[in-house]
Amino acid sequence: MFQTFRNAWKIPELKNRLLFTLAILVVYRLGCAIPVPFVSGSALTQMFANGDMLSYLNMMSGGALARCTLFALGVTPYINASIIVQLLTVAIPALENLAKEADGQQKLQQINRYAGAVVALIMSIGYYFVIRNMGALKHISGAAGVFAAVVIIATFVAGAQLITWAGEQIDDKGIGNGISLLIFASIVSNWSSLYTSVTGLLTRAAAGEPQFYILLPVLVILALVAVVFVVVMTNAERRITIQYAKRVVGRKQMGGQNSYLPLKLNMSGVMPIIFASALVSIPGTIGSFLQIDQTAHPVWYAFFHTFNYTSWLYVVIYLLLILAFNYFYVAIQYNPVEIANNLRRNNGSIPGFRPGKPTSDFITRTLNKITLIGAIFLAAVAVLPIILGNLTGMSIQLGGTSLLIVVGVALDTTRSLDSFMTMRNHKGFLG
């Protein structure tokens, strides 16, 4: 492993990409510490200590939302905009045709940026009224109040757009997926709270509750098992054997070898988790923004409170969204008919199946089975911690989501590094 890192550092292009990625991540974390003007961040601490839906947004921003800093909105506007654009791409034929054009993805990315700016503006206005209702503003009336509102909202929007730009820069000049790495950095930066949780368990054990001495190592073992399980399932794949017919080109005989078509168990990666979390958090976040009083509006309070982590309806909706987004992502990423046509053009075939429709039907059936298993895996890892949290009363609802994101992003980044190493005839991270 250490020799691999040394070899990676000897490749100038890879070294520059690594340094650039690290520099962007450092700038991102610095932006998460720059306070927004005219706001008292200490007044917002209690609002984020209640474990409601704002906790999810705070996790995605690396704690910047609770501190009301430049990057308070995090990557959430970009993610929500991506959901909207991708759903519209499937629903609107013009956008679907645009996606198939040579420069279609660049145009869709531009639409994504504009949509992200609109979502960021809406969220900024909502968050402004939240901090105003919490009494965290230094100016709320007169010309000073208007000026403060404009500066605060503009700062939030600018921060969100800067994060989007930073993610795209990592995509172009760095290593790995930019937005995913920013989410990774946000989640890891919040893991310092694990120390507080551990010391809390030890304190309760020392105070006369010895069962927590047993609970702590059990939780550690479960966490390690969960990490191993996620790594194994993320790397698992179904390999379909491909045979290529022999053909003569000039005086040389080409083809005749066997290969395989890899179908990963978790093809969609962590995106279904991220998208489902972002989507299911919208009603609860709106409820937090509106600060609805239970006595004055009991119906609306009950409706928005339904989308809290402690609600079983939230668990069901979250589960269904993960399943739906997993199938949706696989459907737009893999086209069995196109794969079958490519095999036919290259004189390839799957043993036991004729080229054309029989081949595409077999790939479709195999893909559906794998997608179901992958969707159940994602849903189980994401939902089980929430269920355990509801049953035990412990605040571990973000554990499954954050674990999947961190492990998934780490593996994807490792693969990117490995591909660079392999192309330059060095031994990669993955062997």
Predicted feature residues:
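N-terminal cationic and glycine-rich segments that engage phosphates or anionic surfaces
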Residues: 1-99, 103-431
